[in-house]
Each structure stands twice: as structure tokens, then as C-alpha cells.
Regions:
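Conserved ankyrin/ankyrin-like repeat signature
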Residues: 21-22, 57-58, 89-90, 125-126
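Cullin-RING E3 adaptor/co-adaptor recruitment helices
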Residues: 146-195
Length: 195
């Protein structure tokens, strides 16, 4: 039986779906046959997908057997997707590992991708944790073209009051005379000063 058929597809899918025992068994067979599975193929793709799928136990095992995995590959993709899909434990673990390695993850990669998408997707615990790491995230702010990115405007469509209140609480420019602050408050019928 060729366990490496189709570029080690069996191993990759076992990892990606969180089947740790299956992945360990396949890896052991490859060792016994003298053909080690290439865990770092395609710029550590398996590790990145495992983290994005929330399989902390598999990610920890992969890092244990291959300590030089680039956990920051593809501009912090493992971290960003863990935040995107609400896998807080995975994101926190990756952040801790990066600190231990002396190269802390850039939590602001891809224009605050992890924070923006955790807010948009309603992952309040992830957003709060990210904000605690970098307390001066500007979530309501003009860009150089005079336009704005506003997680609040996006999340108001979901009718998630807790998330909206939190974003307004940490915003850098929540002043009563700020149109970006007043407009969403007016639309959502929130009284300014009572958020």
C-alpha cells in the first residue's frame, strides 16, 4: 500500500479533519519504511489548514515532530484563520509559541484581518482578546481617501448589540460630533452617551 499516494493526501486529510490517531499511524508507517512524510510541503500548508480548522491537538503534535514549522507562513495565515473561525484556543497557542520563539505573530497582518473578521463574524471573545493585545485598534476611522472602514456598520446588519457596544467602547474617535459615531447610533437608535 502506498501511503504517500496523491502527494500524501491520506495524511493531509487525516490532519485537516482532526484525526490525530490516524495521522500519527500514517506518520509512523512512513518512518518505518524510511520515507518520512513531508509535513512542511507547500509552505507548511497542512499546519496552516489544521489551525484554521481548529484542531489544536493536531497542530501541537505537528509542531512537536517538526519544530521548525513556519507558524507565520503566508502572512500569519494560521493565526488569521483561527481568529476568523473563532478558534480562540488555537490563536492564543500560536501567539504564545511565537513569543517563545522570539518572533511574535503580527496580529495586525493583512490590515487587521484577524480583528476585522472576528468582529464581522460575531466572535466577541476573539475580538476582545485581540484588542487586549493591542489596545489602540482604531475600528472607526477615516482612511486617506476620506472613506472609512467601520466594523460597526458591518456588524449592525447582524443585530448583535453586544458586539456593537463593544466596538463603540474601544473606538478611537467616539465623540458626539463625529459623524461616524452619530450615524450608526442614529440608525441603530442608540442614545449617544448611553452605550
Amino acid at each position: 500500500m502506498d501511503i504517500s499516494a496523491q502527494n500524501e493526501e491520506a495524511f493531509h486529510w487525516a490532519c485537516n479533519l482532526g484525526h490525530l490517531e490516524m495521522a500519527q499511524w500514517l506518520f509512523q508507517i512512513s518512518k518505518e519504511r524510511g520515507h518520512y512524510i513531508n509535513i512542511s510541503a507547500i509552505n507548511d500548508w497542512v499546519f496552516r489548514v489544521v489551525c484554521g480548522n481548529g484542531h489544536l491537538h493536531v497542530a501541537q503534535w505537528l509542531l512537536q515532530i517538526k519544530p521548525d514549522i513556519n507558524i507565520s507562513a503566508q502572512n500569519e495565515q494560521a493565526f488569521r484563520t483561527a481568529c476568523f473561525y473563532d478558534y480562540l484556543a488555537v490563536a492564543q497557542w500560536l501567539f504564545q509559541v511565537s513569543k517563545e520563539r522570539g518572533k511574535t505573530i503580527n496580529i495586525s497582518a493583512e490590515d487587521e484581518y484577524a480583528f476585522r473578521w472576528s468582529c464581522i463574524n460575531g466572535h466577541l471573545a476573539v475580538a476582545q482578546w485581540l484588542q487586549s493585545l493591542k489596545p489602540y485598534l482604531y475600528v472607526i476611522n477615516y482612511d486617506e481617501n476620506g472613506e472609512y472602514q467601520n466594523c460597526y456598520i458591518r456588524c449592525k446588519k447582524e443585530a448583535n448589540w453586544e458586539k456593537r457596544k463593544y466596538l463603540l467602547y474601544i473606538a478611537s474617535d467616539c465623540k458626539e460630533d463625529n459623524l461616524l459615531y452619530r450615524l450608526p447610533c442614529d440608525v441603530a437608535k442608540i442614545m449617544i452617551g448611553y452605550v
